[in-house]
Amino acid sequence: MLRSEKSVAVEDIVNIYKESPSVIITHYHGLTVSQVSSLRESLKSQEAGFKVVKNTLAKIAANQTGLNNIVELFAGPTAIAYSKEPVGMAKLVVNFAKANDNLKIIGGVVDNHVLDKHSIKELSKLPLLNELRGKIVELLQAPATKVLGVLQAPSSSMARVIQAHASKN
């Protein structure tokens, strides 16, 4: 690889680190091209990506972006999964790793916090951001409907009492 190609590759990885608050570092040794393509396609549906990286270049990019904590994770045949939404990407990568023993999760970074492989597996168990938003809206709407029911109850009870009294007379 020429020096100019290396600098372009480092710049590309630096952009990934800067634009994606979540990165999962994996070893992909033994995956077929079709398996890697399948993983890339499923990640693309979550607006995420998967890139095979050269360890020395990934380390240089990590040092340039202040991610010095992850440098030691780059050893062996390494690829990174990256996304702006960490939970959806973690779910896809963890599920793919369960189905394909040749993909090993090494660690990662979410919002500049270094995670080990166990933390990434726990992250994958969390609900997606859109699911959380839906639950919050649901929780906010529930008290309003209960208050409305309580406010309507006395008036409907009063109407029934008046109706009963009117039917007696």
UniProtKB/Swiss-Prot annotation:
Matches recorded under Gene3D superfamilies: 3.30.70.1730, 6.10.250.290
Its biological purpose: Forms part of the ribosomal stalk, playing a central role in the interaction of the ribosome with GTP-bound translation factors.
Protein species of origin: Rickettsia canadensis (strain McKiel)
Keyword rRNA-binding: yes
A matching Pfam family: Ribosomal_L10
Quaternary assembly: Part of the ribosomal stalk of the 50S ribosomal subunit. The N-terminus interacts with L11 and the large rRNA to form the base of the stalk. The C-terminus forms an elongated spine to which L12 dimers bind in a sequential fashion forming a multimeric L10(L12)X complex.
Domain of life: Bacteria
GO molecular function, one term: structural constituent of ribosome
One Gene Ontology term from the biological process aspect of the record: translation
Keyword RNA-binding appears in the UniProt entry: yes
Keywords for the protein's UniProt record, in alphabetical order: Ribonucleoprotein, Ribosomal protein, RNA-binding, rRNA-binding
Family of the protein in this entry: Belongs to the universal ribosomal protein uL10 family.
Gene Ontology cellular component terms for the protein in this record: large ribosomal subunit
Protein name (Swiss-Prot/TrEMBL): Large ribosomal subunit protein uL10
PANTHER family, sorted: 39S RIBOSOMAL PROTEIN L10, MITOCHONDRIAL (PTHR11560)
Database matches in NCBIfam families: PRK00099.1-1
